[in-house]
């Protein structure tokens, strides 16, 4: 019976939604410097778009400062442009091959906006998890209708899918709560 339906595959897909949320939340600016803030930055390098981390080293020497060490001197202007074009609201200050980004304090209004964005990301992740649950339950129902699994197996698998869904939603809620706390901490 386990070869007809794999709950672990559903869990993996649900985990993917939580990982995606973690990545999206990492890109939200919280007033505290973080190397992950620059993950969405794309740089026009060598004739193609590349992630910033493929042309430079990003570090956080101070709580409100991000340092970008560009490997190739000819790429400094392109990296600056990529940072400005990313709409992160950061102003690059260049010294040779090092670009410094000061992270300004967030005002109350901007903090509330960021919390709303975080909630939107979390809701999208919850919806993705629910879609995975629906796919799983539909598959189980089809297997039962085709008499490939018994009604008891269907009920047991339905419960396992629901348990996996609850765990994934709880993880998403925890990620959101942590990010909200980080954003609202002055």
From Swiss-Prot:
Subcellular location: Cytoplasm
Residue stretches in coiled coil: none
Membrane-traversing stretches: none
GO term, biological process aspect, one: cytoplasmic translational termination
Main subcellular location of this protein, as a coarse class: cytoplasm
Gene3D superfamilies tied to this protein: 3.30.1360.40, Ribosome-recycling factor (1.10.132.20)
A GO MF label: ribosomal large subunit binding
Record flagged with keyword Heme: no
Signal peptide positions on this chain: none
Record carries keyword Protein biosynthesis: yes
One GO cellular component term noted in the UniProt record for this chain: cytosol
Keywords: Cytoplasm, Protein biosynthesis
Family named by the database record: Belongs to the RRF family.
Functional note: Responsible for the release of ribosomes from messenger RNA at the termination of protein biosynthesis. May increase the efficiency of translation by recycling ribosomes from one round of translation to another.
Entry protein name: Ribosome-recycling factor
Source organism phylogeny: Bacteria, Pseudomonadati, Pseudomonadota, Alphaproteobacteria, Hyphomicrobiales
């Amino acid at each position: 019976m386990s070869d007809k339906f794999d709950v672990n595959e559903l869990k993996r897909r649900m985990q993917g939604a939580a990982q995606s949320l973690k990545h999206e939340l990492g890109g939200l600016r919280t007033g505290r410097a973080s190397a992950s803030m620059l993950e969405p930055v794309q740089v026009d390098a060598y004739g193609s778009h590349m992630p910033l981390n493929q042309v430079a080293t990003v570090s956080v020497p101070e709580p409100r400062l991000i340092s970008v060490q560009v490997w190739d001197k000819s790429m400094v202007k392109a990296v600056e442009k990529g940072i400005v074009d990313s709409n992160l609201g950061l102003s690059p200050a260049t010294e040779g091959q090092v670009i410094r980004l000061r992270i300004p304090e967030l005002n109350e209004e901007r903090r509330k906006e960021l919390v709303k964005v975080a909630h939107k990301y979390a809701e999208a992740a919850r919806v993705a998890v629910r879609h995975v649950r629906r796919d799983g339950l539909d598959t189980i129902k089809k297997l039962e209708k085709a008499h490939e699994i018994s009604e008891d197996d269907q009920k047991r698998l339905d419960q396992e899918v629901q348990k996996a869904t609850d765990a994934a939603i709880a993880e998403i809620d925890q990620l959101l709560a942590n990010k909200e706390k980080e954003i609202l901490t002055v």
